[in-house]
Amino acid sequence: MPNCFKFHTVIERHWQKPYPVLSFLLKPLSGLFAKIAAKRRTDFLSGKRQSEKLPVPVVVVGNIHAGGTGKTPIVAALVSGLQEKGVKVGIISRGYGRKSKAVHVLNAESRAEDAGDEPLLLFRKTGAPTAVGSSRAEAGRALLAAHPDIGLIVADDGLQHYALRRDVEIAVFPSADTGRTDLDLLPNGSLREPLLRLDSVDAVVVSGGKADALFRPSENMFHSRIEAGRIYRLNNPSEILDTGRLKNQTVVAVAGIAKPARFFDSLRNMGITVKRTVALPDHADISAADLPDADAVIITEKDAVKFSDGICTDNVWVLPVCAIIEPDLAAFVLERLEDVPKAV
């Protein structure tokens, strides 16, 4: 695992600031990847490969990057916005990182190994019925069977899952990449699909800041920013941390997410002096035994769902975050769906 993590770290650095030698080696592979990805999409759109339509509208929220765009908080915000407008929303996802391959409809006893960390986090944050499966259509059928009153499904990270038909496509794109001219497809770059793909989606959500002035992939462009909530104790979420008491304590921050620097920066921006940071691979397994010794250990919400109740020590705290999307993305989705007939 450590060697794989180091190699992946090198590749990610290359994606952000390309190394000429690596680009020379990887560029031909990116060309091959582009042809395969284009053919796959064309086959589904032309009907050469079959896709399935669910009996309720499907809104796909995904990205053309290989992770790290800040999508999960945006999905949570969209689902919450739809719920506030009276819509019974369900969520489907692949459930990356879980131990089982079977379709799983989440319940109060579900764990990260059953559902994956991100779907479990979405389920707990929104309360929306949620199902996971490698086949999104199969997950959708199972979800509707368990919750027949669902009126709309949000598919988390399914933009390239063309086996499931969709009524609205939303792509999340990081603001840091909106002005770049050196983006490339995998493996030379971080893109799953070319930038032109953004011209065919219904909306683009620029995450983490404002877009470059020349970035106009869609007439329907939204912006999102992350707001940190109040840090709470993992063993007792109703207990809020008084950050002033950390002044003379040893604080360690631990994150198993795609862009851990964002999390560490958020803590520092809150005035917390972090003595040590621990960056783990995205979706990494983590338990109480893996946590460093410190007066206070602060972790992400995504990592927090991996802990079973009652097995963690009292020095572990969680920083919750939420996405603020402007203008109103949920209202846009409902307006878009007014002209979409219900599947039969």
UniProtKB/Swiss-Prot annotation:
Q: What does this protein do?
A: Transfers the gamma-phosphate of ATP to the 4'-position of a tetraacyldisaccharide 1-phosphate intermediate (termed DS-1-P) to form tetraacyldisaccharide 1,4'-bis-phosphate (lipid IVA).
Q: Which GO terms describe its cellular component?
A: plasma membrane
What pathway or pathways are given for this protein in its record? Answer: Glycolipid biosynthesis; lipid IV(A) biosynthesis; lipid IV(A) from (3R)-3-hydroxytetradecanoyl-[acyl-carrier-protein] and UDP-N-acetyl-alpha-D-glucosamine: step 6/6
Q: Which reaction does it catalyse?
A: a lipid A disaccharide + ATP = a lipid IVA + ADP + H(+)
The record's EC number reads 2.7.1.130
Q: Which PANTHER family match?
A: TETRAACYLDISACCHARIDE 4'-KINASE, TETRAACYLDISACCHARIDE 4'-KINASE, MITOCHONDRIAL-RELATED
Molecular function (Gene Ontology), one example: tetraacyldisaccharide 4'-kinase activity
Quote the InterPro entries the UniProt record gives: LpxK, P-loop_NTPase
* Family per record: Belongs to the LpxK family.
Provide the protein name.
Tetraacyldisaccharide 4'-kinase
Keywords, alphabetical: ATP-binding, Kinase, Lipid A biosynthesis, Lipid biosynthesis, Lipid metabolism, Nucleotide-binding, Transferase
Which Pfam families does the entry link to? LpxK
Q: Which GO terms describe its biological process?
A: lipid A biosynthetic process; lipopolysaccharide core region biosynthetic process
Top-level division of the source organism's lineage? Bacteria
**Protein residues bound to ATP:** 65-72
